[in-house]
């Protein structure tokens, strides 16, 4: 499982994303989380988390996309607790 999370993050780091692009999470209990500054997503700071309320996701503006959709968009929305 760690390897899958690592690969997901590695994909983010080595990929050049635009707001229209997306990446996949590989575990059914994972969602994707981005930390955003302003309106610009930072794919290198995105990672797959086991739950959208994971502490890592609590900073800045984020978007979560469940595994059931198969994709995690780089669009940013404000975090609402």
Swiss-Prot record:
Keywords: Disulfide bond, Metalloenzyme inhibitor, Metalloprotease inhibitor, Protease inhibitor, Signal. The keyword Disulfide bond applies. One of its GO terms (molecular function) is peptidase inhibitor activity. The keyword Disulfide bond applies. Disulfide bonds join 25-48, 32-76, 33-57, 36-72. Residues 1-15 form the signal peptide. The record marks 80 as: Interaction with carboxypeptidase. InterPro entries: Prot_inh_LCI. Tightly binding, competitive inhibitor of different types of pancreatic-like carboxypeptidases. Inhibits human CPA4. Belongs to the protease inhibitor I46 family. This is Metallocarboxypeptidase inhibitor. It comes from Hirudo medicinalis (Medicinal leech).
